Structures are given as structure tokens and as C-alpha cells.
């Protein structure tokens, strides 16, 4: 099995280092990852300037670009073969509920899926530096073997979130759906020493709806959450209702 690894925390992140270590035990690994942190870039693709890549290890490439760039460049140029699987992570911080729409980690898995390659995004549920990246990486490695053996439904990729706990303390994985988060955005508005305004986009304390069966419900109770995500964003349940509208 040959696996392409990437992330959005950057090529030198501890989560990626843990993933390399654990996945290398079950597969041949090549890393194509951003040269710096690219958190919250979602599915951004670099189109207005050239991409540059540097080989910084035997099978490790650092790219001046987004996670989506890395998957594109890896599959279409840097690798001499088509990987059997793409794994993105281990992200520092959860990618659950509505946050998946912002996530560069999840978007890298989406990009691989668009190319017809099975993919997994894996994140460590923590608001601090994170302690148990290896436990999350071990979960990803085990799941990679299962996905390689069984395959995934068409246009489907997996979003995995692992509580920041020692491996022996993790509860069994649960198959979940995407949850819901309540956003109360804030803008930090300041003035620099030259009298110019500058801003930071921030949020107040975040809250999630604790709904049984969701990713948040699982991880908040110590379970590993595995959510099957899909390329098709259509709300199929609303189609018939919208057809009844008197559209202009």
C-alpha cells in the first residue's frame, strides 16, 4: 500500500511527524505538505503565482502552497505513481460540526476524493498544543488498512476526530454525522502605532449542539468519531419543495 500524507499545520508539525511514524508501519509513505501553517484555508487553490516545492527528506516535500495544492502537486507531478490512499493530518484541533467547511485538513481529503483516490482526514480534539498525536496517528493507520481492504463508497471520504487522550483511554470508534456549532463571531479592532486600523477575525466561546449521533457528541464522551463526508452538497430533501415555487 502506498499512501500520500499531507496536512494544514505545516510540514514540520508534530501531528504530521506522528502520522509519518505510525503510517510507515503499514504502508510506503510520501509526504507533500505546506511549508508553513495553512489552517482555515479550506479548499483554496493557488492560481495566481507559481508553486515551489523542495525535497527536504528522502520522501518528504515542502510546498509553498495550500493543502489542496499539495495534493494536486503530489499526485500530478511529484509522485511517480498514483497513491492508494491520501491521509491528511494529524490536525492540531478538532474538525467537527460546521468547522469542516473551513478546514484545510478536510479539504485535502476532499481534493483527493475528487481525483478518485480514497482519503481520510484526521484531527486531534484539543484546544492546547496537544499531547497524544501518536494515539490519533495510530487510529489513522489502522483505519487506512481497513479502507484499503474494503474501499469507500464513491465520492465519499472520512473525517476522523480523536480525543486528546492516551490510546488506552480512548473509547471505541463511532460512525457519526456532522454536528452543528453555534457561531458568535467577533472582530478585534485595533489601531497600530502609525494610527492605522487593523483587525483580527476571532470568535467568542464556541458551543456545539450536543446531539446524539454527531461527531461532537462522540468525541465529548471520549469516543473516536468517524464521519463519512460526501462531495455532493445538494440538499436533496428540498428539491421537490423548491420546484413548487413560482420562480421568476
Curated annotation (Swiss-Prot):
Its EC number is 3.1.3.5. GO terms for molecular function: 3'-nucleotidase activity; 5'-nucleotidase activity; exopolyphosphatase activity; metal ion binding; nucleotide binding. Binds 1 divalent metal cation per subunit. SUPFAM superfamilies: SurE-like (SSF64167). One of its GO terms (cellular component) is cytoplasm. It catalyses: a ribonucleoside 5'-phosphate + H2O = a ribonucleoside + phosphate. A divalent metal cation binds at residues 8-9, 39, 91. It is found in: Cytoplasm. Gene3D superfamilies: Survival protein SurE-like phosphatase/nucleotidase. InterPro entries: SurE (IPR030048), SurE-like_Pase/nucleotidase (IPR002828), SurE-like_sf (IPR036523). Its cofactor is a divalent metal cation. The keyword Nucleotide-binding applies. Keywords: Cytoplasm, Hydrolase, Metal-binding, Nucleotide-binding. Nucleotidase that shows phosphatase activity on nucleoside 5'-monophosphates. NCBIfam families: PRK00346.1-3, PRK00346.1-4, surE. HAMAP family: SurE (MF_00060). Belongs to the SurE nucleotidase family. This is 5'-nucleotidase SurE. It comes from Citrifermentans bemidjiense (strain ATCC BAA-1014 / DSM 16622 / JCM 12645 / Bem).
